[in-house]
Amino acid sequence: MLARLLGRLGQSVLVLLVVSMVSFLVFRYIGDPTVSLLGEDASVAEREALLHELGFDQSVPVQYAGYLKQVLSGHFGISYRFRQPVTEVIASRVPATVELSLAAALFAVVGGVGLGVYTAMRRRSLVSRTIMGVSLVGVSLPTFLIGIGLIYLFSVELKWLPAFGRGTLVDVGGWQTGLLTVSGLSALVLPAITLGFFKLTLIMRLVRTEMLDVLRSDYIRFARARGLRNATLYGRHALRNTLIPVITIIGLQLGSLIAFAIVTETVFQWPGLGLLFITSIQGVDVPVISAYLLMIGLLYVGINLVVDLLYAWADPRLRRR
């Protein structure tokens, strides 16, 4: 187990180095910082002075080493658009994206696992067939179209839920949250469903497929022949062995929620990292773009590591290796 952990840590470091190189190339070669910071009317001397201050007149290896040093110290430069440190700009948007992603993850995991188990246990019922039919919508339709449809139904026609924004926020130790207000919770419903719906249908279909395979196995037939109750049979034996092979896929899918939040946040004008990334691309705010890419890479590496550990915990055979 320790050797497996050390091996995964080594792989994670290598992946992060590659991501940092890509982030550095974006930071160095996309856009012109002199135009963004000084404007088009700046003189040649002013441009050269700024390039010297930013270190762009040095060799590429020296610049990359300096970039790594800045990243490790938590400094990503100054946002061209906001004229603030990138860390402050990103930190102000983190609560919105984290709350949206957690709500979508909860919706996807609880709904996906629950519906997957139900449709496997009652696979011939009309309800199960209806659920499987509806799941095709989540797999087929793009996220932005689902979001627009929910906005039209629940915001325009029924007027039950807001169509954009986060609602009323409360400051809790510097964390701007909408989870403590009614308007904040109501504003979270549609974006969370939109972001998590595809993941829910994917998890549901995966769990259903694995559950059906487990229920056909010999040890389940033997347990049923011994007279075990259905609650024990499904909950203790079938479900545990069903989740082992899908833990990795579920973890990776949930890890992509923050990255996929770009579309959802744009549709609902949710003031999170995804919307910040889109506006940064439109405004060629390269430091923010670079920091966002590096952060997403770090997130994926961290989630992969956690998923591997969970997989080893769930499967005793891996713990003995």
Give short role names for the model-derived ranges.
Residues 2-4, 16, 94-127, 143, ...:
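Alpha-helical transmembrane segments of integral membrane proteins
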Residues 2-22:
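Hydrophobic secretory-pathway targeting helix
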Residues 12, 20, 43, 108-109, ...:
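Residue-level recognition of pore/gate-forming positions within transmembrane alpha-helices
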Residues 15-65, 154, 158-180:
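Hydrophobic alpha-helical transmembrane segments of membrane transport/permease proteins
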Residues 22-30, 58, 67-69, 134-165, ...:
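Membrane-water interface segments at the C-terminal ends of transmembrane alpha-helices
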Residues 44-75, 220, 269-280:
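Short hydrophobic, aromatic-rich alpha-helical segments embedded in or entering the lipid bilayer
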Residues 52-60, 77-86, 168-188, 281-287:
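Membrane-interfacial helix-loop-helix junctions in multi-pass membrane proteins
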Residues 57-113:
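An internal, D/E-rich "acidic patch" concept
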